[in-house]
């Protein structure tokens, strides 16, 4: 049975894990790292780079290197948070055909789901390389506070990547699974998850294989990226003050500043001071300019203090919704790279009145939890019951634009809820059901998930028709809504698709595009591997020809030289053809066989001569030594 993998699709880094026997195991990528940067880059010649290779070239190719795209997934172009991001990233955010926020590279638009799919493909390949078999099914994690549109877009990304997404699981819940799988006694825990782009807090009751989420809260636009940007803004301001040059419009300089800010932030988690040193950051008429600045931990903490404080209100709301006090929390589990920051740990300690638990790897625990959930679905992990909740209230718009809740936030899922409504006007023959998600009292202030019409109602006075609206949320947190006229039995239902979102046709097109890219990438990789093998063979054959060429005939030497030249031409081509390189490699191996034979015979002859000399020199000594050493008396003495 093919393995189901667990993927933590992160804003900054992603991670893949799988059940190995009874334990979940993180799989290392091709570069030997346990996490992969969530970055995709497009070079000028159209080559696509994912992960570490994309990150390595970001400084020289800032406008075509896409990062933190998860923050845009399932969001409209006009969204205020998208507006904010537009001015902070070096790449271009554009309006997609469906009104969603898309990104642009080399003049081509990509949906965030497409870019996420490229990262998922990389994770899929990492798992396939380790397992030695095809992987087609996965459990993918999302921030607990993701709304329906964002969950649907993540599922679409999996589909584009060629994966059947068996379950979308909340990141804090996944972390709790990994933390509490072997814990028998009952506990109430808080999972504080501050990652690269999102913040979640979940309160869970765990024990004896049952993981029940009591409440969840968070902010889907708060994370390490914001901390980095705050530091970048400070560096830009300091440089402008000292040199009178504004680096804000220099995309290359901004990318260098961003990398330096991230590095400094990480260093300041373990040291009190660091130095940011960026030579040749820019130039003016007087010559090149360098940025050198000492940064203390205290200064960084003062710059980001309000960001850390923003995590407190969701924590208090989650505690209130769960009906527990901070003192009743047995353990606070820290998740996400930003939770390593001493200031964050200090705030958590003050809030919950106890030292947070640091026994899990904050970068890997979510992927491990996803792998455990995959094991549960596959039947490999027994006696685990996971009860998650919907993070936001769901309802419809009623008379006067009021938001009428059908399902309250923190309701355990899967769940189904019905409520009966009626018409607002006489002889109304159709009603529009507008489905929203959020906590505000007016529907317009909440996130519109979608709308549909129930038509064909018989003319009747207002308030007479009985229209039953049913909300159905599955275990992934994805919503289906139906409306039924009780009088006529007419029914209309939709699986909620955001007013933007991707249509099935869009997804199908992107799947084909991804498959074409996968084939292209495979060809490119095969060509690189063939070229590497060819270069190695050329080097060893040239060396052998130089050392032992006199042992073969002139005709053989010429044939070998010609084969080397042909292979060099094939491997140095602008668009190398793997099959052509392999064929010419084979030819060189065949014509070199006589040379190999000559080398073998020469080495054998040398070895035989050396062995003969050694026995001639050492023969007498050996016999004498044996004769002198082996004596009965000596044996008795030694015994």
Curated annotation (Swiss-Prot):
Induction: By stress conditions e.g. heat shock. Gene3D superfamilies: 1.20.1270.10, 3.30.420.40, Actin, Chain A, domain 4, Substrate Binding Domain Of DNAk, Chain A, domain 1. One of its GO terms (molecular function) is unfolded protein binding. InterPro entries: ATPase_NBD, Chaperone_DnaK, Heat_shock_70_CS, HSP70_C_sf, HSP70_peptide-bd_sf, Hsp_70_fam. SUPFAM superfamilies: Actin-like ATPase domain (SSF53067), Heat shock protein 70kD (HSP70), C-terminal subdomain (SSF100934), Heat shock protein 70kD (HSP70), peptide-binding domain (SSF100920). Keywords: ATP-binding, Chaperone, Nucleotide-binding, Phosphoprotein, Stress response. It comes from the Bacteria. It holds the Pfam family HSP70. Residues 516-542, 605-639 are annotated as: Disordered. Residues 605-619 have a biased composition (Low complexity). The modification Phosphothreonine is found at residue 198. Belongs to the heat shock protein 70 family. Acts as a chaperone. This is Chaperone protein DnaK. It comes from Rhizobium leguminosarum bv. trifolii (strain WSM2304). The lineage of its organism: Bacteria, Pseudomonadati, Pseudomonadota, Alphaproteobacteria, Hyphomicrobiales.
